[in-house]
C-alpha cells in the first residue's frame, strides 16, 4: 500500500469563470489515458465535459462541485480537484485548496487577471499553496500572454516569469518555444498528441535568448549551484540545475512559472503536465499542521509517514448515484478497508466499508491507502471539515475559513411530499456546504435558506427539484442585515417573579460596549460573589439569546462586548433560568442606550465590458448607492471596480445586459458590513414594526 510519495501530486485547477479550466482538465484526462474521446463543455454531442457530472453543470456550462479525479503522467500519480470559477462557489475552492499541495492558476490570454483570479490567488496565499500559471486560450483574437504575465506581477504581486514563448498567436498558434531546453515544440495531429521538437525558428531566436537570460538570472537566486554554473559558462548550463532552481522557488512560494497554450486547440497541455510533475510539490515537500486536542490545541507538524497513527480530513461530501461519498485527504498513517476510525468532532467510531478513487463520477475500488493521498469513502456520516484518526492520536486538522452568508431566500414546499423531500435535501446540503445555512423563522413559519449569492441559492433550489423532487415556491431574496452598537451603555436589571412555591430572582448589572473584532464577547468582572459562580454561564447564555434578534429591524446583533460587574441573588429563588431571563432584560435595558445602528453587507463588484459602455455602467453603479473604487482601460475593454450594497444588486445582471447589449459581465463577492443611510434604516425599522403588528 505504501507508495513513493515523491511520485504523488495533489493539485487543484482554479480560475476565473470561463477561462477554460474544465476544458483543460478534460484534455489532461485525455493525454493521461483516462478518457478516450474529447467532449466539449457545452458540446453539441450532448455528452458534456467529463468533470461536469451534475446535470445542472452540463446545462449551465459552469463547474459547481469540485469533482476529484485521479490520473497518472509518466509514472507520477496526480489527484486533480477541478474547482468552480464562479464567485458564489468560493467555499468549494477554499475546501479544495485546504487539502492540496499545489495548484494550477488558469488565466485567459485575452481577459488576463480578472476579479475571480484575484480572489482565487488570495485563497491560495492563505493556504500557502505553491502555484504555476497556465495562460489558456492563446488561439483567441487579442491573445497576449506577455501582457497577462505582467498582470500576474502587478495585480497579484507574484514573481511570475514565462517558461515558454508562443510560436504564432491567435489563429496561427502552432506550438511553443521551451525557454529551458531552447527547443521549439509543435503540437500536431487531430488531438495535438503528435509532438514534434525542432530548433527554434531563426526569427525568434534572439528574443528567446534574451528571455532565457532574464529567466535564469531570476531563478539563480534559489540555487547557489545554478549561480556558480552561470558565472562559469552561461551558454551551457546543466538543464537539471534549472529545473531544480525553479522547483525550489515555486515550493518556497517565491516564484511562479508561467506556461501557455490552448486547451481547446490541444496545444501546450502536455508541457503543463510535465511542469506539474517537475515543479509542484509532493506531499513530503509541504508542512501540514495539526492541532493536539489533548494539549490545548497546540500545533504540531504532521509526518506524512505510513507507520505513524492515521490522520485524515474530510473535505467534501457528495450524494452521488453510489450513495454518500466522503472525499478525504490522508495526512499520515494508513487506512484499510474494514478499519475502525474516530470522528474527532463527534467522538463517534466509524467503520470504513469501501474505499475508492474517483474519476469524476465514476469509481475504482481500492483496498487501502497510505499517507498523502486523496480518496473517497462510502457511507460515512460526517460533516465537511471533520478530522478522522485512529485511537492512538487525538487531534484535529486546522479548521477551514468559512465566509458568512450574505443573502437569504424564503422557500415553501407546495405539498406534504415536497415538505418531506425538502427536509432531506436541506439536511444534506448543509452538511456538504458550510456556507449554505437554513433555519425556520418561527414568527412567519417560513423556511429560510442563506448563502453566498443569488446563483448559489438558485443552484440549490434547482437541485432540490431535480435530485429530491421537492417543488418549492421561492420568495424574494432578502439581505442579511446586522445590528450593532456604537457606544458604551450601562445596564442594571432585576428579574423577580413570585407565583406561589419557589419564585425566580436575579439581578444583573454592568455595561455593553462596541467590539472591534468578532461577533460577541462576554467578560466576567464579578467580585465578592455578587452573582454565584454557577450562574455566570447563565448570564452569558442570556446575552447570547439576545443577539439572535435585534430591536431595530429584527436582524442578528454583532460586535458587542457584554461586561458584568455587579448583581444580586436569592438563596432559594435564584436559578439558571432566572439569571438567563435577567440577562435578557439587562441586554434590552442597555441596547437602546448604546445607540444601535443597522449594518448592511457591501459587495465588491467588478464589471468587465467594452469601453464604449463605461459611462453607462458607472451611472448604473452610482444609482445603486455604489462607490467606484477604481477603473482601468485595456484597449477597447474596461474594468470597473466598485463597492455596492447587496440590497441594490438584485436584478443587476438584467440591467447590465440591456445597458451593454449583453457584452459586459460582472462578478461580486462580500467585502464588509457598513451602516445603512438614515432613510434606508428608517424604512427597515418601519417595515419590521408593520410585520410585528400584522404577525
Swiss-Prot record:
Binding-site residues for GTP, renumbered to this chain: 15-22, 82-86, 136-139
Pfam family, one: GTP_EFTU
Domain of life the protein comes from: Bacteria
Molecular function in Gene Ontology: GTP binding; GTPase activity; translation elongation factor activity
Residues annotated as domain tr-type G: 6-284
CDD domains: EF-G, EFG_III, EFG_mtEFG1_IV, mtEFG1_II_like
TM segment ranges: none
InterPro entries in the cross-refs: EFG_II (IPR041095), EFG_III (IPR009022), EFG_III/V (IPR035647), EFG_IV (IPR047872), EFG_V-like (IPR000640), EFTu-like_2 (IPR004161), G_TR_CS (IPR031157), P-loop_NTPase (IPR027417)
GO CC annotations, alphabetized: cytoplasm
Sorted UniProt keywords: Cytoplasm, Elongation factor, GTP-binding, Nucleotide-binding, Protein biosynthesis
Keyword tRNA-binding: no
SMART domains hit by this protein: EFG_C (SM00838), EFG_IV (SM00889)
Localization in the cell: Cytoplasm
PANTHER family: ELONGATION FACTOR G, MITOCHONDRIAL
Task of the protein: Catalyzes the GTP-dependent ribosomal translocation step during translation elongation. During this step, the ribosome changes from the pre-translocational (PRE) to the post-translocational (POST) state as the newly formed A-site-bound peptidyl-tRNA and P-site-bound deacylated tRNA move to the P and E sites, respectively. Catalyzes the coordinated movement of the two tRNA molecules, the mRNA and conformational changes in the ribosome.
Membership in a protein family: Belongs to the TRAFAC class translation factor GTPase superfamily. Classic translation factor GTPase family. EF-G/EF-2 subfamily.
Entries under HAMAP family matching the protein: EF_G_EF_2_B
Protein name as catalogued: Elongation factor G 1
Name of the coding gene: fusA1
